[in-house]
C-alpha cells in the first residue's frame, strides 16, 4: 500500500487560496534565509497549527506523558468558544490544522464540532486517535464532520503484542471502530477522511510489520505507515522498546551496549517557522516536543496569536535554535533530522 494518495493530495491543495499560498511562500523564504544568515527572520504566520483537544487519555502507554500521568502543567479540555475565536483569527492564512498534541481527541465532547467549524473555514483538518471511541455514531459523525485525515494507532496485530505498548487498550475495539469508519465513508459516498493506520515500531511488535500491512488491506483503510518511536530514556531503554530493526529506529547502539540518537542536531528547525502548538488552555509552545509546555511563548487569553508570533521571546527562541539547538532541552530527543516514517 503506497503512502501517496492522490485524492488526499488534491483535497489538500484545494484548500489553498492566494492569501494562504503567499503566506506559505513568505514562511518558507524566511526559514531558508534564516538558515543561510544564521539570524532569525520570520515572515508570515504559521502554515500549520496543532490544537490540543485534551490532555486526558484512556490508555497508559509507557512513553507518553498523558498515559504516564506525568504532566506538571494543568490538565483539561479545549473549549469550543475559545477554539472558535482562535480559528477566526487564524483562518485567513492557515492551511493545515492538526487536532492532537497530548491526550485522546475523542474524549473532548466538542471535538467533532470543532472539526466542523475548521472545515467551514476551508482548513485541512487531521487527527490521530487510539481508535477506542469510534462507535457507530461517532464514526458517522466523523465522516459527516468533514474531517480530512484520520490516523488510527495500530501497534500490533494480536492483543498480546498490541497491549505491550498500548497498555489498557483493546485491539478488538480498534478494529471494530476502523470498520465503522470505513463503512460510513462508503455509505455516505465520501472521499474523506483519508484513513491510515499508524504502526509505532517498537521491539515487541517489529515482527508484525507485514501482518499489519495485510490487516490494513483487509480492513479497507487507505494505507499504513510505520513510525519510529520516541524513547525518553533511550540511552538505557529500560522498557526494552528500541527495535532491533535499525532502519526503523531513531537510535543506534554503541559499543558499550547503550544507545545514542541518530540525530545530527543541525542548528535549524522548520517547525519553529511553520507549525506551533496551542495547548488546551491557550498556551503557545514552539513545537510538539514541548510536552509539558515549559517553553511558553505566550498566552492567548492575554494576547492575539499574531502578537505572540512576532514578539521578542519567540524571536529569541528561534535565535537559540540557530546558534545551538543541542543546548535546548526539548530538542535533545527531537525527530527533526532523523527518520520518522518507514516503508
What are these regions (language model features)?
Residues 2-149, 160, 164, 168-172, ...:
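Conserved alpha-helical substructure of the radical SAM core
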Residues 101, 108, 136, 192, ...:
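Residue-level signal for alpha-helical context at structural boundaries
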Residues 52, 56-59, 264, 326-329:
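Disulfide-bonded cysteine motifs in exported proteins
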Residues 1-13, 52, 73, 78, ...:
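Radical SAM enzyme [4Fe-4S]-AdoMet core and its adjacent flexible, acidic
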Residues 58-66, 289, 329-336:
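Local cysteine-cluster metal-coordination motifs and their immediate loop/turn environment
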Amino acid at each position: 500500500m503506497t503512502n501517496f494518495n492522490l485524492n488526499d493530495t488534491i483535497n489538500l491543495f484545494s484548500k489553498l487560496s492566494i492569501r494562504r499560498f503567499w503566506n506559505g511562500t513568505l514562511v518558507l523564504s524566511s526559514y531558508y534565509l534564516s538558515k543561510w544568515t544564521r539570524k532569525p527572520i520570520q515572515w508570515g504566520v504559521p502554515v500549520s497549527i496543532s490544537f490540543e483537544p485534551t490532555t486526558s487519555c484512556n490508555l497508559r502507554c509507557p512513553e507518553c506523558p498523558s498515559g504516564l500521568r506525568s504532566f506538571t502543567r494543568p490538565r483539561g479540555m479545549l473549549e469550543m468558544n475559545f477554539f472558535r475565536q482562535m480559528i477566526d483569527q487564524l483562518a485567513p492564512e492557515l492551511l493545515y490544522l492538526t487536532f492532537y498534541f497530548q491526550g485522546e481527541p475523542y474524549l473532548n465532547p466538542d471535538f467533532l464540532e470543532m472539526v466542523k467549524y475548521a472545515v467551514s473555514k476551508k482548513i485541512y483538518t487531521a487527527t490521530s486517535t487510539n481508535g477506542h471511541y469510534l462507535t457507530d455514531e461517532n464514526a458517522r459523525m466523523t465522516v459527516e464532520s468533514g474531517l480530512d485525515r484520520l490516523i488510527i494507532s495500530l501497534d500490533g496485530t494480536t492483543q498480546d503484542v498490541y497491549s505491550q505498548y498500548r497498555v489498557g487498550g483493546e485491539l478488538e475495539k480498534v478494529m471494530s471502530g476502523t470498520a465503522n469508519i470505513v463503512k460510513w465513508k462508503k455509505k455516505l459516498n465520501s472521499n474523506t477522511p483519508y484513513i491510515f493506520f499508524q504502526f509505532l515500531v517498537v521491539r515487541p511488535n517489529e515482527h508484525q510489520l507485514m501482518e499489519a500491512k495485510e490487516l490494513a488491506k483487509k480492513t479497507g483503510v487507505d494505507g499504513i505507515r510505520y513510525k519510529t518511536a520516541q524513547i525518553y530514556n533511550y540511552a538505557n531503554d529500560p522498557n526494552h522498546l528500541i527495535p532491533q530493526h535499525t532502519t526503523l529506529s531513531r537510535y543506534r547502539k554503541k559499543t558499550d551496549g547503550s544507545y545514542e540518537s541518530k540525530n545530527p542536531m543541525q542548528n535549524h528547525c522548520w517547525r519553529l517557522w511553520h507549525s506551533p502548538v496551542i495547548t488546551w488552555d491557550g498556551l503557545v509552545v514552539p513545537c510538539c516536543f514541548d510536552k509539558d509546555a515549559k517553553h511558553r511563548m505566550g498566552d492567548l487569553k492575554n494576547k492575539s496569536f499574531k502578537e505572540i508570533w512576532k514578539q521578542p521571546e519567540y524571536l529569541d527562541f528561534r535565535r537559540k535554535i540557530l546558534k545551538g539547538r543541542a543546548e535546548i532541552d526539548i530538542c535533545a530527543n527531537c525527530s527533526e533530522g532523523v527518520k520518522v516514517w518507514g516503508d
